[in-house]
Every structure is written in C-alpha cells, then in structure tokens.
C-alpha cells in the first residue's frame, strides 16, 4: 500500500489521559521505520506549539505540525505556514456569551492562554498544558485576534451554549474536542484543512494519506484521507459512523501501532 503521509491526533490517540509519559516506545520505533521508508509523519492536534513540540521530539517527527485544530500549521521549528484566526468582532461576542451564561472561556494568543479568573476549570486545564497563562479582565484583552476560543463546562451546558453561539454568530467553526471542551474557531480552521494544506504543498493525493483520531474534531480529517481510523476508545456514536475495518484498537491497547503494523507493514 502506497502511504506517503500519516497524521496523528495526540490526546487519547497516541497518548493516554493527555500524559506525555504514555508514548509507546514501540510506536517511536515504528515511526522511525516509516520515515526510513520515505513516509512523512505529522501531528494534527488541538494543542498549541509549546505543548506539541515535546511529543513531536519524543516521536522523532520532523515534518509540519497542525495545531489548534487546524487554525495554525507550522514547520517543526515553529515557523507559521498557515493561520486562520478568530477576529476581534467574533471573540468579543463570545466574551459576552460567556458572561451571560457564566461559562468558563479561554482565549489564545501567541501560545499564551488568557482567562478572566482562575477557577477549577483552568486549574485542571493548566495541569495538561505547557502554555503560559495570563489572568486578565477580558475588557482589557485587545489583541487583533484569538487563535481559538475554548469554553469549558459540563456536556449538557455546552450543548445549550453551542445553540446560543450558533444563533448569534455565523461563519465560524464550532467543534467538541472533548466532552467538556467546546471550541470556536475561524470557519476555515479545521484539522482537515490543515491536512489538505500539507498534502497540496507536496502534491500528495488524499488516498496516499493515513490519519488517526478519537474525537469529533478528528471526524472530517478521518473521512477525507484514504485511510482514516477512529480509535476504539472513541464514543460509540462516533464509531458508528465508520466501517468496522476503519476502527483501530483502544489507545491503551496500542491501537495506533497495531493498525500501522497491519496496514503499512503487513504484520
């Protein structure tokens, strides 16, 4: 099978529980062998650059990184190749909605997270990221853009919040990256658009690409490439959208590694 590019989601796909220490040494070895065969490997994640680089280095990845769910594409040195950002008019309306509904909101600018208050939501979030944090009244946040806007709360709260956002703001991309994270991005910011950018840059057909992911924000990417695999630990309603042969094993059971062994190495 002629696979030329492989795209990995990070959390709960190649990592367990957002823990960098759970990277499989067997997967590291396989990635090296794939690269020796001329296959290029990329990460496609909701993470920012500073939280993605340690994973890329551990895996030996030297090619483009798709960050912030496709809002930004960089080379491995952090040089920006593509960005699609949330403009001021949109993020100011999101701030209003956050205050009206009393739902926690993160804004992102240059690998720094901005919040209005330090609460349990951001305490938990910061335990999983290497990004910087600034606590500031959002009335004083006057940057020209936010890379993305992230609401954190219970699933049912975010379900209702999504409806309210969609009723008031158009031309945006809204996606769940976890059951408790609702992300609002530029309408062109999507992992699949990051994948398309990389494939077009090198003249690679989508049928020569493979991808792995576990959440709603991975769906379009997995359906676009010729070889897209949803993880066995994904929620059932998402797995139901894929043929059985497009479901990889659970991340705790080396699901990515086993599927690579099967599809690329014929093991």
Where does each model-flagged region fall?
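Conserved acidic, metal-coordinating active-site core of Asp-based
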Residues: 97, 101-221, 233
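Short, acidic loop-to-helix structural element flanking the phosphoryl-transfer center
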Residues: 20-39, 83-90, 132-133, 189-200, ...
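Asp-based phosphoryl-transfer active-site loop
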Residues: 4-19
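Short, hinge-like loop/turn segments at secondary-structure boundaries
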Residues: 60-62, 82-85, 122-126, 191-193, ...
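Mg2+-dependent phosphoryl-transfer enzymes with acidic/Ser/Thr/Gly-rich catalytic loops
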Residues: 1-5, 24, 183-267
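Active-site phosphate-binding/coordination module
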Residues: 24-121
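Residue-level signal for inorganic ion chemistry
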Residues: 34, 69, 149, 222, ...
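Short active-site oxyanion
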Residues: 38-42, 62-63, 148, 207-209, ...
């Amino acid at each position: 099978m002629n696979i030329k590019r492989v795209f990995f989601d990070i959390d709960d796909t190649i990592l367990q529980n957002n823990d960098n220490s759970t990277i499989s040494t067997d997967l590291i070895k396989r990635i090296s062998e794939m690269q020796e065969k001329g296959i290029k490997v990329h990460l496609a994640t909701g993470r920012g650059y500073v939280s993605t680089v340690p994973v890329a280095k551990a895996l030996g990845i030297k090619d483009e990184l798709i960050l912030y769910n496709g809002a930004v594409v960089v080379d491995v040195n952090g040089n920006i190749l593509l960005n699609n950002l949330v403009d001021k008019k949109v993020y100011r309306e999101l701030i209003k909605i956050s205050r009206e509904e009393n739902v926690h909101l993160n804004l992102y600018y240059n690998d720094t997270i901005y919040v209005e208050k330090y609460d349990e939501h951001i305490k938990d979030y910061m335990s999983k990221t290497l990004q910087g944090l600034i606590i500031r009244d959002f009335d004083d946040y006057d940057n020209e853009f936010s890379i993305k806007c992230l609401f954190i709360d219970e699933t049912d709260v975010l379900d209702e919040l999504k409806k309210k956002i969609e009723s008031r703001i158009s031309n945006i991309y809204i996606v769940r990256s976890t059951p408790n994270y609702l992300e609002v991005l530029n309408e062109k910011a999507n992992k699949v658009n990051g994948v398309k950018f990389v494939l077009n840059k090198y003249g690679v057909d989508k049928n020569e690409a493979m991808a792995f992911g576990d959440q709603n924000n991975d769906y379009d990417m997995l359906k676009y490439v010729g070889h897209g695999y949803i993880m066995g630990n994904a929620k059932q309603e998402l797995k139901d959208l894929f043929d059985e042969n497009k479901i990889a094993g659970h991340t705790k059971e080396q699901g990515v590694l086993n599927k690579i062994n099967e599809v690329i190495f014929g093991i």
